[in-house]
Amino acid sequence: MTVYEGSFTPPARPFRFALVIARFNDLVTEKLLSGCQDCLKRHGIDVDPAGTQVDYIWVPGSFEVPLVTRKLAVSGQYDAIICLGAVIRGQTPHFDFVAGEAAKGIAAIASQTGVPVIFGILTTDTMQQALERAGIKSNHGWGYAMNALEMASLMRAMAPLTEG
C-alpha cells in the first residue's frame, strides 16, 4: 500500500494559486487575505500581485465567488484556489441563501474539476465573531492557505494515479 500526504516544503516546480476575495464585508475579508498572504509568503510563495505565483480576483460578494472560481478552475492554470468571504447573519433569510449557495457551489467545483478549492467563507452570527476569526483571536486566513498548500502538494503527489 502507498501512503499519500501533502508536504509543506517548496516543490521543484512552483505552485500557482488563485485567491477569490469577496468585497462585501471587506473589513473582514481583507484581514483573511492578509493571513493567507502571510502564510503563503512564509512557505516560499511569491505573493506579489505582479508575480507569477498568486492571482487575486475580487468579486462583489460571497454569492459571486463560485462563478469566478469555476472559471479559474477549468482554466487548468492553478494548483489550488482559495475562496475568501464573510457572510454575517442579519434579520432576514438572506444569510441562509448566500451561505448555502456559496458552499454548494464551491464544493461542486472542487469535485467536478479536480482542483482543490478551499472554502474560506466565514459564516457567523455577528461582525464580532467574524473579526475574531479574521485576526482578533486568530486568523483563519492562515489556515486556509495551509490547506491550499497541503492540497496542492497532495494532488501533485497523486498525479501518477491518473497518468497513462
UniProtKB/Swiss-Prot annotation:
Reactions catalysed according to its record: (2S)-2-hydroxy-3-oxobutyl phosphate + 5-amino-6-(D-ribitylamino)uracil = 6,7-dimethyl-8-(1-D-ribityl)lumazine + phosphate + 2 H2O + H(+)
Entry binding sites for 5-amino-6-(D-ribitylamino)uracil: 24, 62-64, 86-88, 119
Provenance organism: Synechocystis sp. (strain ATCC 27184 / PCC 6803 / Kazusa)
Keywords, ordered alphabetically: Riboflavin biosynthesis, Transferase
Keyword Coiled coil found: no
Pathway the protein acts in: Cofactor biosynthesis; riboflavin biosynthesis; riboflavin from 2-hydroxy-3-oxobutyl phosphate and 5-amino-6-(D-ribitylamino)uracil: step 1/2
Signal peptide residue numbers: none
Active site: 94 (proton donor)
Family stated for the protein in its record: Belongs to the DMRL synthase family.
GO terms (BP aspect): riboflavin biosynthetic process
A Pfam family the protein falls into: DMRL_synthase
One annotated GO molecular function: 6,7-dimethyl-8-ribityllumazine synthase activity
Name by which UniProt lists this protein: 6,7-dimethyl-8-ribityllumazine synthase
EC number: 2.5.1.78
GO cellular component labels: cytoplasm; cytosol; riboflavin synthase complex
Taxonomic lineage of the native organism: Bacteria, Bacillati, Cyanobacteriota, Cyanophyceae, Synechococcales
Binding annotation for (2S)-2-hydroxy-3-oxobutyl phosphate: 91-92, 133
The keyword DNA damage belongs to this UniProt entry's keyword annotation: no
